[in-house]
Amino acid sequence: MFLKSCILSINFFAFCFVLLGQNFSVGNTSITFFDSLRNRNINTEIYYPSDYTGQNEPVSNGAFPVIIFGHGYLIEWSAYENFWNALVPEGYILCFPTTEMGFTPNHQFFADDFKFIASQMQIENQNNSSIFFNTISANTALMGHSMGGGAGFLAAENNPYINTLINFAAAETNPSAITATQNISIPTLIFSGGDDCVAPPVNHQDIMYNGLNSSCKTQIKIINGGHCYFANENVLCSFGESSCNSNLSILRNEQQEITNNFLKPWLDFSLKENQSSFVVFNDSLQASSRITYSQFCNGTAIMKERSVNELKIYPNPVFSSFQFQIPKDHLHGEIIILNIIGHQIFKKTITKKLTNIDLSNFDKGSYFIFYQKENKSWINKIIKLDTY
């Protein structure tokens, strides 16, 4: 479906070709980080882009975003091989803390491990004796499954150093992940299994989604999806799920394929700052018959989101200002400009068919233009350049 979405979004076909063409090999290493403030060792398995497959191979040239991934209750990190095999070749570094694997995990300690690894990886980037020297970008995501998804909310709470939060069948934690949502404002993507009986969406992810104060949040429910199928086979997880739903009507590889169809463009947008991927992501939401979804971005529920020819922006790229042209029947809506991480930086009601928008005080870079009227919104993008 991802390829289909790329073809449907014909304006972005060249982007999709590049994205799908990346093909790094998977290197891996093990690092024990030491948090001196907590007197705590944090054993971490790390998978990264390399020109060669294997342990401790050199990292490929580039600056790669970091993803911290939290495991589920009693689920070994190795059960998430499907994630590193899908994402490392696309140019991401995945870090799996192997802490809190016992029968009585401390969820707050686990969340604090996420935060420490995220900051430590940035230090590794500056350490000329590290395998990761000069290979890490400043952009970081928190991801997790089940208990690890819940811990991700705890780690993201009031955390200005994380670019996006993503979780899969997230479960409530102690302290409460649900309570933490009200202090989370970063763009967030929640995956749920429609037939998950271990952490049913109605008792877990639905409440988390509703509580978020994110600038942009999306919840995707995979029709017939289960709890354990986000990961590879794990005996304890499968046993627990079989006790309440022994006959899922979806295959594991199908659920993982659906997940990747949405996860990859979201990461490309939120961590690699490819703004066209946000359009691909939303095209896929609307085109897919295998999911249901809720989305709320910038304070407005998105009922319909598309690029349309009748709304024109010129010139683009922009030096100091652009003209916004709109048909008469679309007047009296609001134009909103967001930066690349989804923060609103401009808002204006449009009352004329041709309006000049001044960007002279904007930094150079990419921006999203939303035009919203009633229950519809249109999206486009601009590039701001320095004035000669």
Range-by-range predicted roles:
Residues N183-E257:
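Active-site-adjacent alpha-helix of alpha/beta-hydrolase-fold enzymes
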Residues E305-Y388:
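C-terminal outer-membrane/trafficking sorting elements
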Residues Q22-G62:
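N-terminal cap/lid segment of alpha/beta-hydrolase-fold proteins
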Residues G149-N159:
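Short glycine-enriched nucleophile-adjacent loop
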Residues S78-P97:
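Short amphipathic alpha-helix adjacent to the substrate-entry channel of hydrolases
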